[in-house]
Regions:
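N-terminal amphipathic/basic-hydrophobic helices that include classical n-h-c signal peptides
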Residues: 1-28
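Charge-rich, low-complexity N-terminal segments
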Residues: 19-168
């Protein structure tokens, strides 16, 4: 699905260059970025149409807010990493907490970052098997080249956790 993801703006990778939440380009301005990782439990009757709607809305709205990230779904649990400026991220997390399509949203990692791990993905969706090994292998293949080892390892470890073989 990498080719179908909305592009968040490759110029955003350049240090000191960013699209801010007001949509204005600012050069030479230090941009305050954060990365938030959360997990949640999907509604029992969530179907493929619901998942597609979540993905399409996330791509559209995240591109508008200059939020990038990755959404992993294993049929029962979501694992999502979102990156962007603090205010739009806080608003998104509050919206996600109120979304009836999932419950039990738990922020597992929230940290300042110097640069985005997923600069080209307004929201990439990776659907994985509930089986640990298959889920891990699928995620490994889909993660972008050049992803920092710490981020790669966290995504793989948390994918294993939502796959039920490691306690959350």
């Amino acid at each position: 699905m990498t080719g179908s993801s909305a592009r968040a703006g490759a110029d955003n990778r350049l240090r000191g260059t960013a699209v801010c939440s007001d949509g204005e380009w600012r050069y030479g301005v230090a941009v305050n970025l954060r990365s938030i990782t959360y997990t949640s439990l999907a509604r029992l009757d969530l179907d493929a149409a619901d998942l597609q709607a979540i993905h399409a809305t996330a791509q559209r709205e995240n591109a508008r807010r200059n939020i990038t990230g990755l959404l992993i779904f294993n049929g029962t649990h979501f694992l999502q990493i979102i990156e962007g400026e603090p205010e739009p991220l806080a608003q998104l997390v509050e919206n996600l907490r109120r979304d009836p399509r999932h419950r039990g949203l738990e922020v597992r990692h929230d940290t300042p970052i110097d640069e985005r791990s997923f600069p080209d993905w307004s929201m990439e969706l990776v659907q994985v098997s509930a089986a640990r090994r298959e889920a891990r292998d699928t995620v490994r293949k889909r993660l972008p080249d050049g992803l920092p080892d710490g981020v790669r390892n966290r995504v793989i470890r948390m994918t294993e956790q939502i796959s039920g073989t490691v306690a959350l």
